[in-house]
């Protein structure tokens, strides 16, 4: 199963690929921009 966690302190998320790259750098599976405020959410196994 895959879960998502919101990354605090990263500011607005404009491009999914940038978010995914940042998440992978911190050990997550990837990530994408979501929500009205466009924040980066990282993917992880849960």
Swiss-Prot record:
It comes from the Eukaryota. SUPFAM superfamilies: Scorpion toxin-like. GO terms for biological process: defense response to bacterium; defense response to fungus; killing of cells of another organism. The keyword Transferase does not apply. InterPro entries: Scorpion_toxin-like_sf (IPR036574). Keywords: Antibiotic, Antimicrobial, Disulfide bond, Fungicide, Plant defense. Present in seeds, cotyledons and leaves. Not found in roots or stems. The keyword Disulfide bond applies. Disulfide bonds join 3-46, 13-33, 19-40, 23-42. Monomer. Belongs to the DEFL family. Protease inhibitor I18 (RTI/MTI-2) subfamily. Has antibacterial activity against the Gram-positive bacterium S.aureus and the Gram-negative bacteria E.coli and P.syringae. Does not have antibacterial activity against the phytopathogenic bacteria R.solanacearum, Rhataybacter sp and Erwinia sp. Does not inhibit trypsin, chymotrypsin or alpha-amylases. This is Defensin-like protein 2. It comes from Vigna unguiculata (Cowpea). The lineage of its organism: Eukaryota, Viridiplantae, Streptophyta, Embryophyta, Tracheophyta.
């Amino acid at each position: 199963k895959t879960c998502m966690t919101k990354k605090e302190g990263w500011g607005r998320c404009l491009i999914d690929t940038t978010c995914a790259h940042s998440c992978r750098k911190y050990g997550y599976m990837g990530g994408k921009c979501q929500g009205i405020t466009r924040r980066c959410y990282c993917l992880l196994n849960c």
